[in-house]
Regions:
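A short glycine-threonine-serine/GTX helix/turn-capping micro-motif
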Residues: 105-111
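Rossmann-fold NAD(P)-binding glycine/threonine-rich loop
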Residues: 31-35, 40-100, 117-119
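Beta-loop-alpha module in the N-terminal Rossmann-like domain of NAD(P)-dependent dehydrogenases
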Residues: 18-26, 44
């Protein structure tokens, strides 16, 4: 257990935020270089976990749905949309890899129901084939 966020993330390679917070509590100055952040909690207007400087200071930003992230994700607090926002779909379809040579990458997840359903089907099919043999 850590007394504060700064101590909790000081040596992290991966940070996942998943709270119902309405105020940013993660500061870019506390995030180590070469760290990846999964921001999951901001999934509606008014919710946030990241201070604006985390978005501004991220080298790569990936979103499950960029337009939805600009409306109800962490990106709703950014004064201008980043030109280098990559959708998760394009990252996968284009078979891209995200190189992180000295910076912070951010995944702003707002939740896309169809992706959740597709993943559930894939997991079920895999489970059925391996465990049930059908």
């Amino acid at each position: 257990f850590h007394e504060n966020v700064k101590d909790a993330v000081k040596d992290a390679e991966l940070i996942t935020t998943l709270t119902p917070s309405t105020e940013g509590y993660l500061d870019i100055f506390d995030v180590p270089n070469n760290c990846h952040i999964n921001a999951v909690g901001a999934d509606a207007k008014g919710k946030r976990e990241l201070m604006t400087n985390v978005i501004d200071g991220s080298t790569n930003i990936i979103c499950d749905d960029p337009m939805q992230a600009l409306h109800s994700g962490e990106l709703q607090y950014n004064e201008w949309p980043k030109l280098y926002i990559t959708s998760l779909k394009n990252l996968i379809l284009d078979n891209k890899s995200m190189e992180l040579d000295n910076g912070v990458s951010l995944f702003d997840s707002t939740g896309v129901a169809i992706e959740d359903i597709a993943l559930a089907i894939m997991v079920y099919d895999e489970y059925s084939e391996e465990i049930l043999g059908s």
